[in-house]
Amino acid sequence: MNSFQIIELIGSGSYGKVYKAIHNLSKCTVALKIISVMNIENGLPVEVKYLMKLRDCKNIVHLIEYFYSNDDKLVMVFEYLEYDLWKFISPKNKYMTLSCTKFFIHQLLEGLDELHSQKIMHLDIKPSNLLINPRFDLKIADFGFTTYIGNPHLAHQVISLFYRPPELLMGSRNYGPEVDIWSVGCIIVEMLTGFYMFAGSNDSLQLELIFKTFGTPTEKNWPGISKLSGYSPYLGSKSKKYPSKSLKDISKFKSFSNSTLDIILRMLTLCPKNRISTKEALNHPWFFEDPIASPPLDDIINCLVSRPVKISKQHQKTNNCNNNNGSYDIIPPNSILVPKRSSSQQAALQTQQVVDVDLQYLILKAEQQQIQYQKLVLQTSVPNHIYKEVYEVNQLLKQYILRLKQQKVNLNNNNLNNNNNNLYGNNNHNNNNNNNNNNNNNNNNNNYNNNNNNHNNNYNHDNNNNNNYNNNNYKNNNNSNNNFSFNNSNNNNNNNNNNNRNNRNNNNNNNNNNNNNNYNNNSNNNSYNNNFNNGFNNNDNINDDNNNNNSYNNVNNNNINNNNNNNNGFNGFNNYGNNFNNSNNNGNQFGANNNSFNNTDFSNDSNYGSYCNGLMDLINNNSMYNGGNYYMNNASFHQRIQEHIQKIQQQQLQQMEDQQQEKLNFRDYHPLSIPSQHHNTSSSDTHNNNNNNYNNNNNNNNNINNNNINSIHNQSSDHNHFIPNNGFTNENNNNHCINNMNNSNNNNNNNIGNIGSNGGSINEMGNNNNNNNNNNNNNNNNNNNNNNINANHNRNNNNGSNDFSDFNGNQMVINSYNNNSNNNGNINGNNNNGNGNINGIIGNNNNNNSNNNNNTSFNGNRTTTTTTTSSNFNNINNNNNNSNNNNKNNNNKNNNNNNNNNNNNNNNNNNNNNNNNSNNNSINNNTNNNNNNNNNNNGNGLTSSYANHFQYNHPPFNISNAPHPIPFLNNQSIPNSNYQFLNRFSFSNYSNNNSNGLANNYQNPFGHGATNSNNNNSGNNDHVFGHNTFNFNQNNNNNNNNNNNNNNNNNNNNNNNSNNNSNNNNYNSNNNDNSNSNSNNNNNNNNNNNNSLFNNFNTHNNSINRGNNSFDSFNNGFNHLKNNNNNINNNNNDINNNNNNNNNNNNNNGITKNNTQFGPNILSSTQTSHNSPVSLTPISVSSSSFSNYSPTSFSSSSMESLSSSSEFLSSESLSFTNSNQFSPLLNSASQDINNNSRSSRHRSKLNIDTKGNNNNNNNNKNNNNNNNNNNNNNNNNNNNNNNSNNINNDNNNNSNNNSNSNNNNSNSNNNNNSNNNNNNSFGLKRYVDDNEEQLLANQKKKKNIKSSPLPSASSSQQSQTQQQHQIQQQSQTQQQSQTQKIENNDGLSVENPIVLD
């Protein structure tokens, strides 16, 4: 008790006493209920027990805490509610209006319904136990008699006498919740008439009054009444009998409507079983007819004025009005306000006096409570519930004051009529609301712009206060054209919002007009973002915070677009300024009020400012004061308010945490970061894409999270640029980026959308492509998510190509992605085909499609750290197979599908891609299950090699001796500080986990190439170093995906090649935007396979066996390995064959991927003791088929023994069901390879080949544009042809180091040979030091000496194997003829590689 200061006694009874008190620490006013005698139930006082159980109910008084005093009295601390229902209806039998009665009774029934649904009876419902706060929330109090339904020990002396039902008066001890309903009926009559329904002095008189009104009950109308203990005394033979009669015959009920009488009679039915329940009462027609339930504005004035109010003499003199009609003093505080209606002027004067008195009282209360709230904010001992209640009271009072002031103005202008509503200006206010709504709808954009500027500036300015060194920049930006651009953007957004609301159904039906408008209008937002980013361009780290503000504001605007159709007024306040003002679309009359409140009351408290604005907007929109349908909303009104408050708090807390985390991440992971000196254009382009994607997604709320994340990562892309020094010096001042995207909890694809955003014209081209893709995506709502995400990747393609444009060996990018893409799968889970496309961008395609496709299952279940360049190999094969099917389908279905394309893509600029894509749509309907899985896997594979492979020329150096620490994801250190790397390397790191979160997602930052681990289950991703040289795969991959986006039927990768063919041939005029991407697609088909083979050779996986996943899904696919050629030749026969081809090709590719797992030893995270440079041991492995294959590292000798067998190609039984079988072999492989005496020479040769391969890739990018059509056609004819092309390209890479023309020739040779060299795609090349004759001799010798322990295949398969072998020999002959010497920068030379079967 020492914690409280008792102010006054406010109630007493047999239960104890209730005091008004102040909590000493928080200065919060509370009610203390002290009970000396208490009923104990299950060890707790009854009242405490049930109040604790019901403390979350909105219509139940809130118990803050309870304790026992020194004298063992129970002290319960309640929220303080000054009023109760009795005070509204008690003064001289003053009755309430019907609408006000409905307003409170509805809340009372809601509270009782909550009690009864939890099997609780209150047993003391009466007006004095129904507390009311200034917001007019009714709360049930006094649970001293409460018990549970079915209690066998019930007492009949419960409930106050005037509200006690007849069964209790007659001594019943077997009753239920019907007794509470009887009390509610009595309260209704009391509220409407101002008199008690039954006011007997004892039980017998009370019963007599009841029977006089409703008649004496009998067994007929009350079965079981004769069994009650009080039946004989009250209803015996000597008792008086009363006839039943209608309430209409009673004078005080004559004015009641039929529905009012009906609900009263159903509540006051004598037989308890016939009484209405709370749920039935809440649905009674009485609540749904005029007058509508509304809060008691007039009655609250009466109640407030009737209380003593201290008014100064000066105020009294001011309010003494002398005029022609006489003088009128102020109404005494204790009198009842019933204005005399002798004249309108008299009524006006009296009402004005009341308003003046009421204003003084309300202002005083508001100021007192505001002081209390300010003190409460600094304390933590009082629950948040009290904070919210106090502040809500303040704001509602202030709103009420504003209304009274308006009424005062109306009174002074004599705008009153004789009726009560006009007396207080309610009707006039209704008209004003309607007019304001109309006017504001017309002028919505202007108000919205002004409000947005204020709120955005205030919000961002608050953030800048935390970063003081950015205040000036921010102010300068606001004073410049930024505001103008932002205003224009808001205008456009508002217009588009209206369009979206009006045409939402049309948008769902492939109407792109509104979406296009959104995109175009949002370009203004982009201009704002551009200026904003430019203003902060030279600041370090702070870009993260300010850009976060921009991204949140942009997304919030779009959130309102999605929510406007349902509940603009309320949801608009979920997210600060922009959303706040978006609500003006519906409730615009409150827009001005919102501004005035924000300028005064809410400036220091955005939580409650937003909340109270939402509350007041709800009041207006629901016509709470204007006779609207508030009773329908009242049931959920307070719940929505509470949810709204929590949502605002959670959003703000989450936003602050995200901002703080981003700053911490940036500082922790980027120790080399310095202020960015470039990338302004890139920043703006990225923001453009974000806004565009989001607005196009207005029809699909699932994309909100994606684009939120995208916006966040745009900031990461903006400011995470650094210029390293010393060992990382960039002599040409090329762009260096560290893209650390740790915020991608929702969408990994959007993160990829920000890779290498380096600015320049290519970025702008990327934006144009994105715009078109976004518009195309709107054609199909089911694919909006996929397309929008892929549109971001389209931007990536161009950014990546820009990154590679200045390829002087000085560019370097570390891409660390700590991505948890669970949300991708969840958001797009219904789009089976689209999932792969979205997640495929970053390798998560495997995860999503692992349940659908064997090949994808293989990749998705990999928990090893194998480099995924082999995945590229497989997926490129899939591309070719699918393209083959699609090209033929295009030829057959071209005319019909062109019509479909026109219907689906009315607003697309990139119709080049869409023509052929749409052609495939009609056929893909039957092949979606197979083709799309293959395609999705294809996206994943390409992305495996998709990284900013920026070459870095530097002498070999030791990481531990680097001039600066290298930032690692999650602060991971290099496994071995003595690792040394090759002279020329490219590195990036992707770790994409779909399920079970992040495992070890921070794979090697410095692999010799891109390491991409795609994990479906949480395996351990070790550091794997793979030597990689495919520099342009990023562009190729993404362009493939980009083309896929334009096709909403998800035959994505199948359409790539067909798109290239048709675009190059038929749409040359439009190929300005897409020609490069199409060429890159072709290069992707060739170069990725080259890289796959090359990386298969150069990648050794020591920790492959870390995964526990088996790959049973490949069992079926191996049976088709030898039948690929036949199936491919039958692609035109029917769609089912196409499906088989796709499946066969996937499995075939999977086998190829298995082969590519065997590569030279590169250090993994398990090797921590090697101090020597990386040694690379060549391995030769031919094509094979594995079932239940778990990738394992092999020694070179073991692999040579396997490859020497002539039956190795046809074997189908090489099965490793348990990865642990090869753990000894794994160790031996590590030892054999690391101890190889020729490591240095191989390293040098590999360096040379790496450069040659890189140069050839550059050449391919430029030169293959001329050969795209031919290459695609050849690739489409045979899946394996493309792989053979890749091998041939590898053979010619070294020769192309000096001559680019040879590259073109090799491409043409590849095209000629692609139809024949089907098996070459499954062969792996090997670098050797011996001459060619010795190699061939050794090969034949090994075939004669060594034999495989594996069982042979069938005769048909052997024949196919022989044919393939012959074709491979022909290919070798051509390739060997092109062998030549190439010298690298170090003067070393090596023979051109040959391919061994």
From Swiss-Prot:
Biased composition (Polar residues): 1156-1171
Catalytic reactions of this protein: L-seryl-[protein] + ATP = O-phospho-L-seryl-[protein] + ADP + H(+); L-threonyl-[protein] + ATP = O-phospho-L-threonyl-[protein] + ADP + H(+)
Biological process per Gene Ontology, one example term: regulation of cell cycle phase transition
Binding site for ATP: 10-18, 33
Top-level division of the source organism's lineage: Eukaryota
Region span, Disordered: 412-567, 671-728, 763-831, 845-949, 996-1101, 1115-1174, 1227-1324, 1340-1397
GO cellular component: cytoplasm; nucleus
Active site: 124 (proton acceptor)
Keywords carried by this UniProt record: ATP-binding, Kinase, Nucleotide-binding, Serine/threonine-protein kinase, Transferase
Pfam families linked: Pkinase
Keyword Acyltransferase: no
Alphabetical list of InterPro entries matching this protein: CDK (IPR050108), Kinase-like_dom_sf (IPR011009), Prot_kinase_dom (IPR000719), Protein_kinase_ATP_BS (IPR017441), Ser/Thr_kinase_AS (IPR008271)
This protein's record includes keyword Hydrolase: no
EC number(s) stated in the UniProt entry for this protein: 2.7.11.22
Residue ranges of every copy of the Protein kinase domain listed in the record: 4-287
Biased composition, class Low complexity, residue ranges: 676-715, 845-941, 1012-1021, 1028-1101, 1115-1155, 1253-1321, 1354-1380
Molecular-function GO terms, alphabetical: ATP binding; cyclin-dependent protein serine/threonine kinase activity; protein serine kinase activity
Entry similarity comment: Belongs to the protein kinase superfamily. CMGC Ser/Thr protein kinase family. CDC2/CDKX subfamily.
The protein's name in its UniProt record: Probable cyclin-dependent serine/threonine-protein kinase DDB_G0292550
Organism of provenance: Dictyostelium discoideum (Social amoeba)
